[in-house]
Structures are given as structure tokens and as C-alpha cells.
């Protein structure tokens, strides 16, 4: 937030910390983890949207959601979940960001590790096919982070491409 280190001589002051915490409090709503069913999470997100005018709902991580239904296969559950999130986004005029971690990526014969995409999450191509946009944050071996947009359904959302950012462990920021 301030670009200052978390420790050492030039860390933020107590007054700056309080300003930062006030900013977080006024710009974010955190839901408790008492009920992690998708219905409960979306019901509470809808209330937050109505109360605060929020335009972004972020669910992190995906595998924390409980969606189990008797007699419904895993891939069908994933499809139903993603379609439900998309419908919620349209009904409430907000962006829904679902943070999902891919399966382990194995090295290619040339020694490189491919960057994951929506096809590499939870054994379902639905993460690629249903999403309007898809991003991967991939830590490279040189300590840099590669941000790849592997899908952008609409041109006003953005375009497919990538950039490399350097992480600053002192401030927790990227440049």
C-alpha cells in the first residue's frame, strides 16, 4: 500500500499502518468461514454488494468451497459451480474472481515447466471454457513472476498476453 518494508529502519509508522488498515476496512469485506457452501458464500456476497456497492467478488481458494451433491459427478459439479458464478456475476453486475490452483505441472523434455492455464485446474476444461477471462500467476525459477492472460472472451476485458514482474520481498509488492 505504501511501498515500505515490513521491518527495518524504513518500515511504516503506526499512524501509516492505521491509515492502511482503515483503507482495507473501507474497501474490502471479508466473509467468515462458518459455511463454505457456494450458496452461502454467494448469498453473503449479494448482501455485501447491496450494502457496500461492491463491484468485485473474490473467492480464494476455489477448493475451500463445498459443493457436494449426491449422485453428481465431480466434473458436473464444477460446471454447475462455474455457471452459477457466471450467472451471479451477470445478475449483480460484478466481476467474480475465482482463485484456483492448477495441478502440478511437470517438466517438459527440454527441462522447462509449462505455464498452467484453465485446462490445468481440477481436471476440468470448464475452467477454460466457461470463464470470460483467465489469468495465471507463475513463479519462474529466476525469482520473477510471469502473469499470463490465457483467455479474454471480450476485447473490453483485455487481451491474451503476458508480462514479467519482479517481486520485492521487503515490501510485498511487484514492479
Question: Model features per residue range: what roles?
Answer:
Residues 1-53, 67, 162-163:
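Cytosolic-facing regulatory segments adjacent to core modules
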Residues 142-175:
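P-loop/Walker A phosphate-binding loop and immediately adjacent motor/lid segment at beta-alpha junctions
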Residues 20-25, 88-91, 157-159:
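Core recognition of P-loop NTPase motor domains used across DNA-transaction enzymes
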Residues 33-148, 152-155:
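P-loop NTPase motor core
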Residues 6, 10, 125, 169-171:
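Solvent-exposed, flexible loop/coil residues
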Amino acid at each position: 500500500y505504501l511501498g515500505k518494508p515490513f521491518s527495518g529502519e524504513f518500515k511504516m509508522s503506526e499512524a501509516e499502518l492505521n491509515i492502511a488498515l482503515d483503507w482495507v476496512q473501507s474497501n474490502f469485506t471479508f466473509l467468515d468461514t462458518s459455511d463454505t457452501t457456494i450458496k452461502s458464500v454467494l448469498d453473503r456476497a449479494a448482501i455485501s454488494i447491496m450494502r457496500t456497492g461492491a463491484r468485485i467478488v473474490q473467492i480464494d481458494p476455489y477448493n475451500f468451497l463445498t459443493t457436494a451433491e449426491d449422485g453428481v459427478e465431480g466434473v458436473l459439479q464444477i460446471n454447475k459451480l462455474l455457471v452459477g458464478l457466471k450467472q451471479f456475476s451477470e445478475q449483480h453486475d460484478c466481476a467474480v474472481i475465482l482463485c484456483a490452483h492448477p495441478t502440478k505441472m511437470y517438466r517438459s523434455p527440454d527441462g522447462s515447466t509449462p505455464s498452467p492455464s484453465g485446462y490445468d485446474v481440477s481436471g476440468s476444461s470448464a475452467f477454460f471454457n466457461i470463464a470470460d477471462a483467465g489469468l495465471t500467476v507463475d513463479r519462474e525459477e529466476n525469482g520473477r513472476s510471469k502473469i499470463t492472460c490465457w483467455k479474454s472472451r471480450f476485447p473490453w476485458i483485455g487481451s491474451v498476453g503476458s508480462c514479467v514482474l519482479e517481486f520485492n520481498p521487503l515490501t510485498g509488492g511487484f514492479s
